[in-house]
């Protein structure tokens, strides 16, 4: 498991999240195995206590003999003048750089099976384990659901299986089957996602060829990456050429998130097949503790389901459809 974590000033980081974040991260590593995880953190230009807290985390990783690279630095002022997605793409690629430079063949002769990205969110180790086991662990990409006080947060990146946008208000999707899946907290096939925490089959980010894993259970819908030839390149007329390993990038034809473009490039490489991108609607992360408690606990109380019914079928659907579907 390769953990890639990125912190940077422009994302309004709250250093108050870092102690909980570090505890959850360390417990996750203990559960998975210290010798099976590589942690990469890239932090830049923070003006709060983040650098100090990251040094404490680094010391603890060293004490536990966990392979890691924590880079806390000040970036050139010119970087702040870059277009936002160009800047974020650069920073994400910096977080991935140790994956190629330090551990290109994995740890102790074992190739990595997953690349896990965790934003600056409140999360529990059980959420990581559940995400990695989405659909029996058979996926190209799997995502949690990230929340802010009103509801679902990452509407800019998430697209349903029909390429439609979603809304922040529960149950998020326009398609009836997808809405029912959210109501029953089941995984949902989507076109793209990120959502605070996302896991990839590591082969999407690997520059080393290796065969499909025998440990993956047989599924009717296998991860596309299991059978893609190497090397492979797509040179569409509309976009920049894409190849493996994936790189975060900008788009020259639309204003899209670097996170969404990663899913798009998976589609381009897999065409005419469809990559197995799954939203695990049962898994909650949030950007502050009160919101996390609200959606992880209070909104799961049985009495709240009456509010869900009244909101979905009467307020959201029948009265304010235009506004709630924006």
Regions found by a protein language model. Give the residues of each.
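Short active-site alpha-helical segment characteristic of glycosyltransferases
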Residues: 255-262
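Short beta-strand/loop segment that forms part of the nucleotide-sugar
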Residues: 36-45, 73
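Short, acidic, metal-binding catalytic loop of nucleotide-sugar glycosyltransferases
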Residues: 23-36
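Active-site-proximal specificity loops/subdomain of glycosyltransferases
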Residues: 49-112
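Conserved catalytic core of nucleotide-sugar-dependent glycosyltransferases
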Residues: 120-238, 310-314, 318-323
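Short aromatic/hydrophobic "clamp" motif used to bind/position activated sugar donors
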Residues: 115
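Single conserved hydrophobic/aromatic residue that forms the stacking wall/gate
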Residues: 2-9, 13
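Active-site donor/metal-binding and catalytic loop motifs
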Residues: 241-245, 272-296
């Amino acid at each position: 498991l390769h953990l890639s974590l990125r912190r940077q000033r422009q994302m309004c980081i709250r250093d108050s999240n870092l102690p909980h974040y570090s505890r959850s991260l360390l417990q996750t590593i203990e559960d998975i195995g210290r010798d099976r995880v590589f942690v990469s953190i890239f932090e830049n230009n923070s003006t709060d206590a983040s650098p100090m807290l990251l040094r404490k985390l680094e010391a603890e990783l060293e004490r536990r003999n966990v392979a890691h690279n924590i880079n806390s630095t000040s970036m050139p002022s010119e970087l702040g003048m870059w277009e936002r997605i160009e800047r974020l793409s650069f920073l994400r690629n910096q977080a991935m750089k140790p994956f190629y430079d330090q551990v290109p063949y994995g740890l102790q002769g074992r190739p990595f099976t997953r690349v896990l990205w965790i934003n600056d969110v409140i999360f529990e180790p059980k959420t990581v384990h559940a995400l990695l086991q989405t659909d029996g662990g058979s996926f190209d990409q799997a995502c949690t659901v990230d929340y802010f006080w009103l509801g679902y947060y990452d509407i800019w990146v998430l697209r349903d299986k029909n390429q439609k946008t979603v809304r922040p208000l529960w149950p998020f999707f326009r398609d009836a089957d997808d809405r029912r899946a959210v109501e029953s907290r089941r995984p949902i096939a989507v076109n793209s996602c990120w959502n605070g925490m996302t896991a990839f089959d590591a082969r999407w980010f690997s520059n080393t060829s290796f065969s499909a894993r025998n440990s993956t259970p047989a599924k009717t819908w296998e991860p596309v990456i299991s059978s893609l030839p190497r090397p492979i390149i797509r040179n569409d007329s509309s976009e920049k050429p894409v190849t493996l390993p994936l790189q975060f990038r900008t788009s020259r034809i639309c204003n899209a998130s670097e996170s969404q473009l990663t899913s798009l490039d998976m589609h381009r490489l897999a065409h005419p097949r469809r990559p197995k991108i799954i939203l695990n609607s049962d898994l909650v992360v949030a950007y502050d503790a009160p919101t996390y408690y609200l959606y992880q606990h209070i909104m799961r109380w049985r009495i709240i389901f009456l509010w869900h019914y009244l909101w979905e079928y009467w307020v959201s659907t029948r009265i304010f459809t235009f506004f709630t579907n924006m």
